[in-house]
Structure formats: structure tokens, C-alpha cells
Amino acid sequence: MEEIQRYLQPDRSQQHNFLYPLIFQEYIYALAHDHGLNRNRSILLENPGYDNKFSFLIVKRLITRMYQQNHFLISTNDSNKNSFLGCNKSLYSQMISEGFAFIAEIPFSLRLMSSLSSFEGKNIFKSHNLRSIHSTFPFLEDNFSHLNYVLDILIPYPVHLEILVQTLRYWVKDASSLHLLRFFLHEYWNLNSLITSKKPGYSFSKKNQRFFFFLYNSYGYECESTFVFLRNQSSHLRSTSFGALLERIYFYGKIERLVEVFAKDFQVTLWLFKDPFMHYVRYQGKSIMASKGTFLLMNKWKFYLVNFWQCHFSLCFHTGRIHINQLSNHSRDFMGYLSSVRLNPSMVRSQMLENSFLINNAIKKFDILVPIIPLIGSLAKENFCTVLGHPISKPVWSDLSDSDIIDRFGRICRNIFHYYSGSSKKKTLYRIKYILRLSCARTLARKHKSTVRTFLKRSGSELLEEFLTSEEQVLSLTFPRASSSLWGVYRSRIWYLDIFCINDLANSQ
């Protein structure tokens, strides 16, 4: 029991007191910190004009005004104005929230930079190349052919604003900062405007995205921290923490209720969840946990997570948000990829003296495929083709110049190839390339009031060479000195660190 309590004690060395005075007085230190992170644009250096809404000086003055005025004198005639602010509430709230998010990110950024400084002779890497989505690439690279079941988990919604505040209580030690955050949330927004749950993820309003993404990520740390704790306690080989890529915080003092319930049989409980073949990843509001265990073990995980989240976050969490699927019978739709395990038949001939036997072996193979139907649906929605995949012209682009039309089609094609470069089978991408290329030709022919064949004969086929840049040419520029033995690895699957999402097809930049 003493050993358990030692593990549950908060790790003081990993906690950073929240520098609350930065908001009011010592902004010079924040300026130095911001300069050290090599940010391209600093909210501290922007001029406090009307176009630069996130100036740190404006944030400081607004918060000071909030504390100098009477908070209870709130106008009821105009929902967008407050008497203690004397101006547009949404504008001021956006500026304050962005400034608060910047200050709150400092302890996490310091921890990130300290972990990165140990590499390459203390050289600081640019943190914009290390994001949460990059932790999904090793997950998709894992061999799932030996696994049996997958848990599809939708992280529960934070049904109360106080939950968002309490998620920071182990990191933010300044009580006045928490009071400011609590007052800010309850004053300006209600839950329906903070997080909308119409889709199986989370969507935030376009205003104050940085602030609420920070709160939601902190909430996500809390939800998934149970995996880190149980994994470290049940596994013989302790996993090495790499804070630059994994967006998790330590569990420790956050399962007191669990220890109270399982204090006597704690080791038995850990034995139930001991699984050296556990694979876990989270991106946005969805988590996936794959295991080699039986259906009974996965069902235990399911009910354990439901009970834990209900007790720890004081919310009603439905079991329907966690689905148990057999990996061999279901395809996984994750981050735009379609992953599945298929049986690859192979024939083996066995020779024994004068007799020979032919043995059929079915070997499991894990594939990451390009979802052709959703991609064609997206192209059809943007009027590049029909719902059956037949290319059509795009009349709204007919007024553009020929070079602009070709550049837009080529950019969309390159973005799709870039995003799905990690796919194990790329034949589907060439069908998408055919659709976009023919749609581009028909758009140009429509503009010049001719047929596609006539236009190509008059202009020449080199007009569409924007689409002819093959992956091999791109790889030769990316890996000019790659040896022949490594060329097959580069050619098969490549993950680019600048991938965040598929841009809107019509407005991709």
C-alpha cells in the first residue's frame, strides 16, 4: 500500500507554478520567453491598434479594468455590451482569452523546450513541427496483424465549465489565476457556445480558438492519463516518456477514489489490465486502443473507463460511446485513412520423401488504404466530378486565367497526394489524379469554348504538366542521397510532419 501511495503522490519536480503576475506587471519576462521560442509573430510585439486585437498590452489593461470596476453592474439591455467594460463584450473577451491562453501555455512550452534542448548539442528545434497529430504516425506504423480487438472511444464531453477549470489545478498553483479563469468562463460564455457536440468530435467557435483548444487539450490529458498510469504499473518494461511528442501529463494524484475502492486488491486489478501488446493513440476527440486480449478483457477495459470517468469528472458517461470491434471484421476510419486487416493467402509446398503436400496458409496483413468513396464524394461536393466519379468542368473558375486554373487544380492534387503519402496502396490516388486532371482540361475547354481534344491539340499536352510530377521525382529531391536499400522504404510510405488535416478542396492554399 505504501508503494501505491508513493506512485500516487504528485511529482513536484514536473510542476510549474503559474506566473500570474505576468498578466499584470512582469510582461518583460514573457517577452524574453516569447523571443526564445522563435515565434514568427508575437502578441507581445504587436502594436495595440484595432487591427492587432491580441496585443499583450491591451490584454493587461482590460484585465486591470475588470478588477477596478464593479462586476455586478452588468447591463441587461444589450447582450453584447457590459457596463464594466464599456465596449463590445465579444471583442474584449476574445482579446483577454487569447492573452490568457498565451500565458497559460508558458509552463507547457518550457517543458517542451527543456526536453528538446537535450538533442543536437542544445540546439532548440522549432516546436511547430512537433504536434499531437505526429504521435499518430507511429501508431499507424505498428503491425496490428497480431491484435484481436479495438476499442473505439469518444472522449466524454466536459458537461460543466468547472471541469475545465479543475483540469488545470495540478499545473496552475496560483489561486487568483484559477479565479480569473473561472470568472472569465462563467461571465462570457455558456457551455453550448463553448463546445458543440453535434459531431463525434469537438468543434469550437471561430473566436477564441487558441484559448479553448488549450483548455480542451488539458481536459484530454486528464481523460487519457489512466492509460499512462496503468501501463507504467502493469508493464515490466517501463515506457520512456518523450514529452515532445506525447501530449500527456502524469496521472499520480488523480485516482484517489480508485485506490479507495481497490486498495486491498490493487495488484489483482492491475493484473486484469496487464497487456504488453496494448496500442493506444488519441487525436482530437477520438481515441483508439488495440489489444491482443480477449473480448472479456476489452469489456473490462470498457466498464473500467466508464466508471473512472464518471467518478473522476462527476459526469454521466454512456457505455455507447465505447465500441468493441473485432479487428479482422471491421475497418478503421481514422484521420481520413481506412485501415483494415486482410487475409493474404499463400501456398506452401511440403515435400516428405515421395509425397508432396500443398498447404494453404492465410497470413494477416495490415493495410492503410485511401478511402476512395469519401474522396470522390468530397470532389463531387465541390463540383469536380459527379457522384459516380465522372470528371466535369468547374464553371465558377472559368473567369480565371489559364495559369490560375491549372495552379488551383495542381495544388489540390498535390495536397491529396501529400496527405495520403503514408498509404500502403496508392493506386486509388491515381484515380483521383485522373479526375482532377480531366476536370481541369474540361474547365479550360469550357473557358475557351471548345472541346477537350481541340483545346489540348491547340495548346499542347505540356500545358497540364503540373499534374505529371511523379512521387519518384519528389522523393529524389527529398532524399537525394538515399541508398538503393532504403529507396524501397521511402517509396512505400512517407509521413510528412507538416500534415495537420486535409485543407478545403476548393480553397486549399
From Swiss-Prot:
Location(s) in or outside the cell: Plastid, Chloroplast
Main localization (coarse): plastid
Keyword presence, Membrane: no
Residues that span the membrane, as ranges: none
Domain of life according to the entry: Eukaryota
GO molecular function: RNA binding
GO cellular component assignments: chloroplast
Chloroplast among keywords: yes
Record's keyword terms, sorted: Chloroplast, mRNA processing, Plastid, RNA-binding, tRNA processing
Gene Ontology terms describing biological process: mRNA processing; RNA splicing; tRNA processing
Annotated PANTHER family: MATURASE K
Biological function: Usually encoded in the trnK tRNA gene intron. Probably assists in splicing its own and other chloroplast group II introns.
Similarity comment: Belongs to the intron maturase 2 family. MatK subfamily.
Protein name, entry field: Maturase K
